């Protein structure tokens, strides 16, 4: 309780915050980090464009449209008949291609930045708080169970690792919350999973060959090499 | 060649064989063989192969090696080198060196296969035997797992069927898990809510972050919470165990377990480890039952924990 008092944290604050962090962690695990990163990227493209953050993407789209138009124009004329015009267009297309490439690189850099930013946010949201809780509040009692509800041996188990009987610490609380959240997620998602049908074994049906045909097949035409010579 | 429909295939073969034998008996086998070998060549008579039919019988080279004089005038050292196992039994003497090596390998690898090395199964490729042992998660468990049949004899359709069967078994296990989980959570929540409301007293069935809650004298209805809890657990765990053994989803769930896989790998080196696999599968089944109990206890802890927040 000493650390809690020093930080002016009430145990129930810890109960709620650890529950929330574990819930977020389980949800992130369920949705998938890559999916969240993709969503963040799409959000950045949509909102960042309006805010002027993702200018390179807008420029890239414009340049690509221009390139497409140029290529179409270039294809419409003959390189032999209108050589000068074709060369001019080709030069422009090459220049635009180089610009598009450099913009693509910029976008890729932006994307990796967004991905790393999402990673850092998730780290601060899920992993780091749990480590802080484990390090700072490992000796804090989160709550006490009512007397007489559980027998002594169950209270002892719930007081793992070193708390007084009847109290619940962070270790047991985090284990319990993880267990319950994953079970609830399973309960909520399993009905929407596609069912697996009973597999049917494919038995090979052998074709019934008439006896005369079989004997004909088994004794093919004998070629006498010696006779041939 | 006069082909008449009345002659049977066997008879026709026999006639051809006799005619061929008669032709061979006339001699000129070497020239005939060279004609066959130089067919299509622009330069004739380049082949100088001699037919075995025209070779002079050499007599006492290979076949008489077994009839050694026990006390010869002078010892032929080459005979000692070339004759395989002069001290061995007379049966093995006739084998050539290469045949000996083949036989030796067959014996070595045949002897390592469980069972015997002389029957059809034992004379298989030893690598295939090892792979077979490696890919049999159900072996030794006494359960009818999808892999209990020989996977190497299986056709692609059969292999696909086995894969689908594994998927189906896993899905069935999950279905049962879902049903039990729903029943468990419903029963436990009902038990908790019932006691929460029946006691009425805001302290006797309440958890708190304050230690004074432990000093209170417990009321009688609060004790019945654990009685009901343990009854629910006994019924649910017993039914789950019964269904798990009957439907065989304990073995399905444990077939991918690290310990079982390790035992499978170990049994390739030490076949005695197979007997521990049965124990491991059983223990993992019990662990699943323990997980049910711990999961239910977790729900109660979470409910009390959240209640301690609401009570403050």
Swiss-Prot record, chain A:
PANTHER family: GUIDED ENTRY OF TAIL-ANCHORED PROTEINS FACTOR 1, TAIL-ANCHORED PROTEIN INSERTION RECEPTOR WRB. Keywords: Coiled coil, Endoplasmic reticulum, ER-Golgi transport, Golgi apparatus, Membrane, Transmembrane, Transmembrane helix, Transport. Residues 210-219 have a biased composition (Basic and acidic residues). It comes from Scheffersomyces stipitis (strain ATCC 58785 / CBS 6054 / NBRC 10063 / NRRL Y-11545) (Yeast). The chain crosses the membrane at residues 15-34, 123-143, 168-184. This is Golgi to ER traffic protein 1. Gene3D superfamilies: Helix hairpin bin (1.10.287.660). It is a multi-pass membrane protein. Component of the Golgi to ER traffic (GET) complex, which is composed of GET1, GET2 and GET3. Within the complex, GET1 and GET2 form a heterotetramer which is stabilized by phosphatidylinositol binding and which binds to the GET3 homodimer. Residues 60-117 form a coiled coil. It comes from the Eukaryota.
Swiss-Prot record, chain B:
It comes from the Eukaryota. Keywords: Endoplasmic reticulum, ER-Golgi transport, Golgi apparatus, Membrane, Transmembrane, Transmembrane helix, Transport. The keyword Nucleotide-binding does not apply. This is Golgi to ER traffic protein 2. Component of the Golgi to ER traffic (GET) complex, which is composed of GET1, GET2 and GET3. Within the complex, GET1 and GET2 form a heterotetramer which is stabilized by phosphatidylinositol binding and which binds to the GET3 homodimer. The keyword Protein biosynthesis does not apply. It is found in: Endoplasmic reticulum membrane; Golgi apparatus membrane. Residues 197-224, 310-312 are lumenal. Belongs to the GET2 family. Required for the post-translational delivery of tail-anchored (TA) proteins to the endoplasmic reticulum. Together with GET1, acts as a membrane receptor for soluble GET3, which recognizes and selectively binds the transmembrane domain of TA proteins in the cytosol. The GET complex cooperates with the HDEL receptor ERD2 to mediate the ATP-dependent retrieval of resident ER proteins that contain a C-terminal H-D-E-L retention signal from the Golgi to the ER. One of its GO terms (biological process) is retrograde vesicle-mediated transport, Golgi to endoplasmic reticulum. Residues 1-175, 245-288 are cytoplasmic. Pfam families: GET2. It is a multi-pass membrane protein. The chain crosses the membrane at residues 176-196, 225-244, 289-309. One of its GO terms (cellular component) is Golgi membrane. Its main location: endoplasmic reticulum.
């Amino acid at each position: 309780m000493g650390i809690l008092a020093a930080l002016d944290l009430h145990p129930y604050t810890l109960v709620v915050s650890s529950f929330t962090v574990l819930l977020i962690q389980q949800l992130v695990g369920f949705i998938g980090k890559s999916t969240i990163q993709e969503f963040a990227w799409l959000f950045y493209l949509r909102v960042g464009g309006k805010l002027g953050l993702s200018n390179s993407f807008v420029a890239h789209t414009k340049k690509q449209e221009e390139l497409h138009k140029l290529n179409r124009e270039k294809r419409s004329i003959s390189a032999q008949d209108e050589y000068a015009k074709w060369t001019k267009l080709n030069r422009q297309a090459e220049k635009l291609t180089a610009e598009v490439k450099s913009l693509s690189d910029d976008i890729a850099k932006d994307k990796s930045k967004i991905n790393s930013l999402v990673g850092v946010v998730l780290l601060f949201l899920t992993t780091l708080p749990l480590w802080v809780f484990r390090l700072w509040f490992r000796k804090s009692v989160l709550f006490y169970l009512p007397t007489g509800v559980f027998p002594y041996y169950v209270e002892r188990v719930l007081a793992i690792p070193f708390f007084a009987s009847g109290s619940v610490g962070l270790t047991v609380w985090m284990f319990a919350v993880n267990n319950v959240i994953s079970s609830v997620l399973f309960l909520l998602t399993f009905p929407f999973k596609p069912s697996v049908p009973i597999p049917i074994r494919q038995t090979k049906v052998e074709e019934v060959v008439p006896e005369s045909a079989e004997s004909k097949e088994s004794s093919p035409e004998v070629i006498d090499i010696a006779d041939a010579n | 060649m006069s082909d008449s429909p009345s002659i049977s295939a066997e008879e026709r073969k026999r006639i051809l064989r006799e005619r061929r034998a008669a032709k061979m008996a006339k001699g000129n086998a070497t020239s005939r063989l060279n004609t066959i070998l130089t067919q299509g060549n622009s330069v004739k008579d380049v082949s100088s192969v001699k037919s075995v039919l025209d070779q002079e019988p050499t007599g006492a080279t290979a076949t008489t090696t077994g009839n050694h004089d026990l006390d010869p005038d002078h010892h032929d050292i080459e005979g000692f080198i070339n004759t395989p196992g002069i001290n061995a039994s007379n049966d093995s003497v006739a084998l050539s060196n290469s045949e000996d090596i083949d036989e030796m390998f067959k014996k070595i690898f045949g002897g390592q296969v469980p069972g015997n090395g002389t029957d059809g199964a034992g004379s298989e490729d030893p690598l295939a035997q090892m792979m077979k042992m490696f890919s049999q998660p159900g072996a030794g468990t006494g359960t009818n797992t999808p892999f209990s049949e020989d996977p190497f004899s299986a056709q692609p359709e059969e292999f696909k069927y086995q894969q689908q069967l594994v998927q189906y078994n896993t899905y069935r296990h999950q279905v049962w898990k879902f049903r039990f989980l729903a029943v468990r959570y419903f029963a436990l929540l009902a038990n908790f809510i019932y006691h929460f409301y029946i006691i009425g007293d805001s302290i006797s069935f309440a958890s708190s972050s304050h230690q004074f809650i432990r000093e209170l004298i417990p009321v009688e209805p609060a004790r019945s919470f654990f009685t009901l809890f343990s009854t629910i657990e006994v019924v649910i765990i017993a039914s789950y165990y019964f269904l798990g053994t009957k439907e065989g989803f304990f073995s399905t769930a444990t077939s991918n377990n690290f310990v079982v896989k390790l035992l499978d790998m170990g049994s390739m080196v030490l076949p005695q480890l197979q007997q521990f696999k049965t124990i491991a599968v059983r223990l993992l089944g019990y662990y699943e039952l323990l997980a049910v109990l711990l999961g239910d206890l977790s729900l109660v802890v979470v409910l009390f924990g959240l209640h301690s927040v609401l009570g403050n």
